[in-house]
Amino acid sequence: MRKTLVVEAAIEPLVRLRSINREDLEDLRKWKNSVKEGFFFKGEINEMMQKAWFAAYHERPDDYLFIVEHDGKKAGCMGFRLEKGRAEVYNVIASPWGKGKGLMAAGLRLLCSYIGSRHVKNIGCVVVKGNPALEFYDRCGFWISGSAADRDIMTLNWDSFRPVKIDQVDEKDLGRKKRPGR
């Protein structure tokens, strides 16, 4: 059963993480298509593909995707998947409005702090070789812990990472409401 989360902390710049919903799908699709060269799937994502992805996403309880918000505006998105004792950060994409303001770095700091305090300490990501996001992850406390022909594997370095204290996590159950008598 999918839960919706809102994660907040006293962090500057002030950002919050909010679980994605159906109303975010078009923004997510446009953002990903605008930077598709930085991802393994380089094709154009159409509306039908996005809706199919969203339906499948709802079936994966250990997969979380958030909108990064600042002053009520969408700064971008980022997510993580829990697999085999590790959290894989994925889809870190700034919106056109959110680029270059430090909001995504603050969002990633909040995300990793949340993961480390509520789930696992082993946090990483996989970056396509040549993707300029590698420098972003490096600035945010990740280091290259492995490599393959087409990708770099990065891991969060807890010795240099500065976690924030999570102030609030609101959870709402998005499952279907049971009718009385069932």
Language-model regions, residue ranges each:
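Conserved beta-strand in the GNAT
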Residues: 67, 73-81, 88
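Conserved GNAT-fold acetyl-CoA-binding loop/helix
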Residues: 36-55
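A short beta-loop-alpha structural element at the N-terminal edge
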Residues: 14-30
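Conserved beta-strand-loop-alpha-helix junction that forms the acyl-donor binding cleft
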Residues: 124-135, 150-155
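Conserved acetyl-CoA-binding loop-helix of GNAT-fold acetyltransferases
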Residues: 100-114, 135, 139
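A short, internal acetyl-CoA/4′-phosphopantetheine-binding micro-motif in the GNAT/acyltransferase core
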Residues: 90-101
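A short helix-loop-beta-strand connector motif used in the catalytic cores of GNAT acetyltransferases and
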Residues: 55-67, 76
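Conserved acetyl-CoA-binding loop of GNAT-fold acetyltransferases
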Residues: 138-148
